[in-house]
Amino acid sequence: MLTVKNINQYYGGSHILRDVNLQASLGKVTVILGRNGVGKTTLLKSLMGLVPIKTGTIEFDGKPIQTTTPYERARSGIGFVPQGREIFARLTVEENMRMGLAYKPASTPIPPELYELFPVLKQMLKRRGGDLSGGQQQQLAIARALAAGPKLLILDEPTEGIQPSIIKDIGRVIRMLADRGNMAIVLVEQYYDFAQELADQYVVMERGAVKAQGDGANMEADGVRQMVAI
């Protein structure tokens, strides 16, 4: 579904991503871990076309996409939940969700399934996004990314600043989506236990490069907890 080969990215004179390789498959959660500042968010932005890569290739659904725009990548079936959520504070919950359908016909309805995944959103459709709690905003950001039915969902630290009960709900939704088998999920996460619980495969980054990768079931045996400990 997603294949990243030898991508490099620079910022000024700094080499941010160094020959990064990874794969994400349908029905699997690929977790990317690493200490702060190792290039995880830059990698996700590169996958979305928000940051250009200098060299390397990114293939999605069998086609190279490294030269396409963020809009084209979203339209091809990639959903993105950025760090910090980036919901529209002055728009209602319903309007925020409709932003995920921006390239669909105006008559396209919000998928009812989103309210099944996140029941709280149905109760707050007319509330402004800025009035929601951090956890509710995160659920809204994920719902917005799911609205168009992506084949690849990319999430950047969805548990950051979120209360434990909602972290469990988000984990449940991620696992459910992966288990259906028609979506690949790439998750950057600092919360090790959450990452370990969800990971079908893991990637550990250090100084912009992939330090280790393997089967999620082997994370503890492979010493991943120690690799990412602050």
Question: How would you describe each model-predicted region?
Answer:
Residues 33-35:
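The feature captures the beta-strand-to-loop junction immediately N-terminal to the Walker
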Residues 128-132, 136:
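Conserved ABC ATPase signature
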Residues 91, 132, 145-146:
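ABC ATPase signature
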Residues 48:
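Helix-to-loop junction immediately C-terminal to a conserved catalytic motif
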Residues 147-151:
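A short, proline-enriched helix->beta-strand linker immediately N-terminal to the Walker B motif
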Residues 64-84, 111, 123-126, 219-224:
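ABC ATPase NBD coupling module
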Residues 56-64, 76, 109-110, 116, ...:
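Conserved ABC transporter NBD signature motif
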